[in-house]
Structures are given as structure tokens and as C-alpha cells.
Amino acid sequence: MKEFDADFYAAMLNTAIVLGYWEKDWKTLRATFDLLHLSIYLCFDVFAKNTARDFSNYLEKDIDAYDHPYPGIRMYYCEVAIADLLIKIKGDNERIRELIYSGFHAIIAYERQALEKEKYRDSYFAIAGTQKGVRHIRGLINGWNEQVEKYSHYSYIPIYKTDKVEDLLYFVGEDGEFLH
């Protein structure tokens, strides 16, 4: 839970900083958000490489075998936090969706072109789409929501709480391929 809190806070803080570019031209704003997404990716890329974690050892090991969630899970819920904050502040509209899609596209393009990752299972996001991954994400989000009341007594600012996640769809099999 501590990592979820720290990751979520970092994603929200960086998004708030980048929102300072809102009045800039569209090209600058989009490039700035792409850089935000790429910087989060690169951060979790370092964690993944330093801990030698990949798709196969995530599926083989117990979720609690490590003291930190898998980097792809952490990156995924940070991206969700960014999208959620954008929508809450600027509304759910075409421009916001374009910013979010652009950030994901920047990550995918970086993985495919710069890192030459050929298969989806090689992407850090792949884990988040597995049955085990969605259960893990749901557990982290709902677990955090249960802790908010406890920690709010120690906080100087309101603690961000998300809606309860009842269910998430998984779309990646244990082989790393998309389910049909």
C-alpha cells in the first residue's frame, strides 16, 4: 500500500505540474504530456531492470513475493491516475482523450521503435491486462480506499480516494497474447 500511495502521489503531482502548460499551444501541451508518460515509463523501466522482473516471473510468483508491485502494474495505475486527474480537472472531452491516447502512443512507439519490443508480452503494460494483473490492481486500489480514513487523520491535505473497483476486464492470456 505504501508504494501505491507514493506512486499515486507522484503521478498526481507531476500531472498537476504539467497542467501548468495548459495555456500553451496544443503542440507544446501534447509534447509535454507525452514526456510525462515517457518519464513514468522510464522510471518503472529502471525498477524492472534492477529487479529482473518480467512477464513470466510475475505470473509464476505470488503477488506478495515482492515488497513492491510489479513495475508494469505500478506504471498502469499511475497512468490511470493521470487520466483520472485530467478528466476531473478539465472534463471528459475529445481534447483530454487525445492527450491520454497520445501519452500511451508515445510509450508504445518508444517500446516498439527504440527498444524494438516485438510482442505485446514484452511490454510492461501486458501484465496489467492478465487475469492476475487485474485482480492485483483491483486489490491495490480497493485496499488503498479502505486505508484513506485511517491516514486522513495524519494528513495536512485531503487524501485522494477513487471509486471502488468492482470488476476489471482482462484481455491478455498467460502466454502474453491477446484473448479472442
Label each residue range with its predicted role.
Residues 27, 55-180:
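Non-catalytic terminal regions of proteins
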